[in-house]
A protein has these predicted regions:
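A conserved FAD-binding loop/helix module that cradles the flavin
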Residues: 538-554
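Fungal secretory targeting signals
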Residues: 1-25, 280, 532, 561
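Conserved redox-cofactor binding core of oxidoreductases
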Residues: 125, 136-249, 257
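A glycine-rich dinucleotide-binding beta-alpha-beta segment and adjacent secondary-structure elements
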Residues: 243, 248-253, 466, 470-539
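N-terminal FAD cofactor-binding segment of flavoenzymes
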Residues: 55-61, 65-121, 142, 147-151, ...
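FAD cofactor-binding and catalytic pocket of flavoenzymes
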Residues: 324, 335-456, 499-507, 513-518, ...
Length: 561
């Protein structure tokens, strides 16, 4: 269960978050002030949107349900070996995996029926930090006019000027834990004909390419929008970040939002908008649709079910509902399969939160070098599976990790994580249970009637296995000589290696159907917007970069209204 953080208020601070606002809360109660923009959720999109709106002169309130994360936000969760530093566990890339065994106060816990970050920075504070620019085909094929690749070039350039992509993350210039990388390169480049490239130097090529992962790190520490966009926002007198606030719904009169209803410090409050104010929902692809539904905006059938469970206030009777059947529809996550690989040249490495190798922590603390400067992924690769019917190809991705998983964790084992990405046909929707907790429906993965998604991913794995001889690698949980049909059965049968949640949630309030292309305004409303992973279609790459581009563009459009 998620613990409740002590309220954390930040405004008008230096980039080091040194001191709170000198005016006391009693003299200037933020819950009673009128705001030009209320942004709900301080994840990778919400932080960027709030920065854009405050930069444009809007009086901007950024609300976060969780609490402190990075050391720069006042986060203090850390192992003993970080004692005496200004870093928290969040700052250390090599502690990324510890979130799954001990999430502390950083994840959403029982407030969402899925794994995700509920803290300042959202999931960008708890994920691996992989940072890949989507290929132009993602925007040109799956997004409407106004959101094609050419329309997003300026937003992409602005993002890269604030948040660089990094492949040389260790300060000493060395790469660590490379036995898996070398084995994968021999397998894929020498054996399977993949090109060895710098992935983000040629972002639009995702057919048979192999390379090192790109991350959003900065000088050996986790980067992301908390370390960049949030810091410029905090320097402005018209911006306030307030954590420990659980927004329940948008308060509205007809199609116009007038504020948000939230719980803060045990009290329910209504935070008002100014006469021309706007609400921007940036809680992620599960929670933003949930907030819309709880506000009486969505599919009438779903709203009726929520009303019958007393989850929608009686003041929002059916005549006040806004019919938008695209709210919560199309929820996407990457179907994944873990393939355990062993070989005589492999030396696996397991990161430790409490008892790491002393020389590795000393290297990190003294010079920001060594294994703890990255999150364990040593190589990444993509290709595409074409279709004879002329429909877009399916994107598929593989990532090599430094250690084994599940029942295969000896010191000669590493993990290949296989994803299906763009072009897949399967998706589900956001559902809300009887307690009002949102999560994914049970048809997210491999639910297309013809079984094409499973066939494409099985084809990818089968093709990879044909190049295994000579690589020195042997798969442990799937036979190297498995047929495509056997592989397809394996990947679609739930196990600790297959059909699990990757938690790359997106696409549940898409541009064009759920929100408009002009300003990401929720259809049927005047001044409610969604800017987060909900609005983008499934991407070929890990979604954080694309979500941040959408936030750059969306923030720009909303600021002009």
């Amino acid at each position: 269960m998620k613990l409740i953080h002590a309220p954390f208020i930040v405004a008008f601070l230096s980039s080091a978050l040194a001191a709170p606002l000198s005016i006391s809360l009693g003299e200037q109660d933020w819950t009673k002030q009128e705001w030009d923009a209320i942004v709900v959720g301080s994840g990778p999109a919400g932080i960027i949107v709030a920065d854009k709106l405050s930069e444009a002169g809007k009086k901007t309130l950024l609300l976060e349900g969780g609490g402190k994360s990075y050391g720069i936000t006042g986060g203090t969760e850390k192992p003993d070996w970080l004692a005496g530093t200004n870093m928290s566990r969040v700052d250390i890339p090599g502690l990324y995996k510890s979130i799954f065994s001990d999430p502390g106060d950083l994840t959403c816990g029982s407030t969402v029926n899925a794994f995700g970050g509920c803290t300042i920075g959202g999931s960008s504070a708890v994920n691996a930090g992989m940072f890949f620019q989507p290929p132009s085909s993602d925007w040109d094929t799956y997004h409407p006019d106004g959101w094609k690749n050419a329309d997003l070039e300026d937003a992409t350039a602005r993002l890269l000027s604030r948040q660089a992509t990094v492949t040389d993350y260790s300060a000493d210039g060395n790469y660590y834990l490379q036995t898996g990388y070398e084995a994968a390169k021999k397998w894929l480049v020498d054996g399977a004909g993949y090109s060895n490239v710098v992935i983000n130097d040629q972002p639009h090529d995702k057919t048979k390419v192999f390379g090192r992962p790109a991350y959003d790190y900065n000088k050996g520490q986790r980067g992301g929008p908390v370390t960049t966009y949030l810091q410029t926002s905090l320097s402005r007198s018209n911006f306030l970040l307030q954590s420990g606030v659980r927004v329940q719904r948008v308060e509205r009169t007809g199609s116009k939002a007038t504020g948000v209803v939230a719980t803060f410090d045990g009290t329910t409050v209504t935070i008002p908008l100014s006469s021309n104010g706007r609400v921007v929902l940036s809680g992620g692809a599960i929670q933003s649709p949930q907030l819309l539904m709880m506000s009486g905006i969505g599919d009438p059938a779903t709203l009726s079910q929520l009303a019958s469970s007393n989850l929608i206030p009686t003041s929002l009777n059916p005549s006040a509902w806004i019919n938008n059947t695209a709210v919560g529809a199309g929820l996407f996550d990457n179907p994944n399969t873990f393939i355990e690989l062993t070989g005589p040249s492999i030396a696996s490495y397991t990161y430790s939160y409490k008892s790491p190798i002393t020389s590795d922590t000393l290297m990190y603390l003294s010079s920001k070098s060594g294994p703890y400067t990255f999150a364990s992924q040593t190589s990444v690769f993509w290709t595409t599976i074409p279709h004879s019917d002329g429909t877009p190809a399916t994107g598929v991705q593989g990532t090599i990790d430094s250690a084994g998983y599940g029942d295969f964790v000896d010191d000669r084992t590493i993990t290949l994580n296989v994803y299906g990405t763009s072009g897949l046909l399967s998706s589900g929707r956001v559902v809300i249970d009887s307690k009002g907790v949102a999560g994914p429906s049970d048809d997210i993965y491999y639910s297309d009637a013809a079984g094409r998604d499973a066939s494409d991913i099985a084809t990818f794995i089968h093709d990879l296995f044909q190049a295994l001889p000579g690589s020195g690698l042997t798969p442990l949980n799937i036979p190297a000589n498995a047929t495509k049909e056997e592989i397809q059965t394996y990947i679609t049968t739930p196990s600790q290696y297959a059909k699990g949640q990757v938690n790359h949630w997106s696409s549940s309030c898409r541009i064009g159907s759920c929100v408009d292309a002009e300003a990401l305004r929720v259809k049927g409303t005047d001044n409610v917007h969604v800017v987060d992973g909900s609005v983008v279609a499934p991407l070929t790459v890990n979604p954080q970069f694309g979500i941040m581009v959408a936030a750059e563009k969306g923030g720009e459009l909303i600021a002009k209204l």
